[in-house]
């Protein structure tokens, strides 16, 4: 399965969002949906949360809800894939500047943290490797750049940060969605 062939395109999703007057970019919407999934969302309740957070609780018309359902499904599948197929939805192409990509990454991370926080209200209490990754994501969301920075150097740095964010999202998904042992599984074996 080719992820690119099944993902709605960045441009088509941006257009659908704009047509419905939703004030999010495709990157931000993907970040939000990814955050909900990585936080443990497993049912259709994700749609209500998206409506509440982006459209004053009003459901989207089919012209937007269908691409979002497709985006949700593909994102869920890639997060659950053992081959780490998950990718961030970012603008690409010759006409997209490194500054546009940096802004999109910041928006993606901010909305990822929003979605994650909606599903994991005690996010600030998470420790160890996952807690460090979440702290790093908070810092990445606030990163800025100077317009006169070397674009080639910034592009290289951005690629590294995108890869880190991708792996941090996968780590969060693993942490918050893995099956927790039930009480009988925790019980010590009984000697007879």
UniProtKB/Swiss-Prot annotation:
Any one of the GO CC terms: cytosol
Source organism, top-level taxon: Bacteria
Family indicated by similarity: Belongs to the UPF0149 family.
HAMAP family registered for this protein in UniProt: UPF0149
PANTHER family (alphabetical): UPF0149 PROTEIN YGFB
Name assigned to this protein: UPF0149 protein Spro_3920
Species of provenance: Serratia proteamaculans (strain 568)
């Amino acid at each position: 399965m080719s992820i690119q062939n099944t993902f709605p395109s960045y441009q088509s999703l941006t257009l659908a969002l704009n047509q419905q007057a939703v004030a999010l970019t495709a990157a931000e919407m993907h970040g939000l949906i990814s955050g909900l999934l990585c936080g443990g969302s497993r049912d259709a309740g994700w749609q209500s949360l998206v409506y509440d957070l982006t459209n004053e609780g009003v459901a989207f018309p089919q012209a937007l809800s269908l691409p979002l359902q497709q985006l949700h499904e593909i994102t869920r599948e890639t997060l659950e894939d053992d081959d780490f197929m998950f990718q961030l939805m970012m603008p690409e192409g010759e006409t997209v500047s490194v500054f546009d990509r940096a802004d999109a990454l910041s928006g993606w991370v901010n909305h990822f943290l929003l979605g994650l926080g909606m599903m994991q209200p005690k996010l600030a209490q998470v420790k160890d490797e996952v807690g460090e990754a979440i702290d790093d994501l908070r810092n990445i969301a606030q990163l800025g750049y100077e317009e006169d920075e070397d674009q080639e150097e910034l592009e290289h740095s951005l690629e590294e940060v995108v890869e880190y964010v991708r792996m941090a999202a996968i780590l969060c998904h693993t942490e918050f969605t893995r099956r927790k042992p039930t009480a009988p599984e925790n019980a010590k074996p009984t000697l007879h």
